C-alpha cells in the first residue's frame, strides 16, 4: 500500500488581487506529486477554514501581500483549531516583515516563506512536516 498524497489548500485571503505567486506555488506542489486545491482570490478566513475542512487537507498555504497577515493568519489558525484541525500545517508566503514572523509562529503558523524562497524549499518543508498516514 502506498502513502497517500499530501493535500494542500492554497488560499488568498483578504482584498489582495495579486495571485501569480499563489498559482506558481500551487503548480510546483502539483508537479511534486501533491494534491492542491486553490481557493481563488478574496477569501475570508471562514471560507478558507471551511474549504480546508471539506477538502480534508494536510496543510493550508496562505499567500498574502496585503499587509493584513497579523489579523488574517491567526484567525485562520483559530478557525482550523475550532474545527478539530490542530494537526493541519499552516504556512504563510508573501510579503511579511521579519519582525512579524515570531508573532505569526506564536499564533500557530508553522512557517513563513518570504519572497525569493525556492519552490523546492517549500516542497521539502511540506514533505518533512506533514504527518502522512497510509490510505
What residue ranges belong to the model's regions?
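N-terminal pre-triad scaffold of radical SAM enzymes
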Residues: 11-15
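Short, flexible coil/linker segments at domain boundaries that flank nucleotide/cofactor-interacting
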Residues: 1-5, 85
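Cofactor-cradling patches in redox/metallo enzymes
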Residues: 22-127, 132
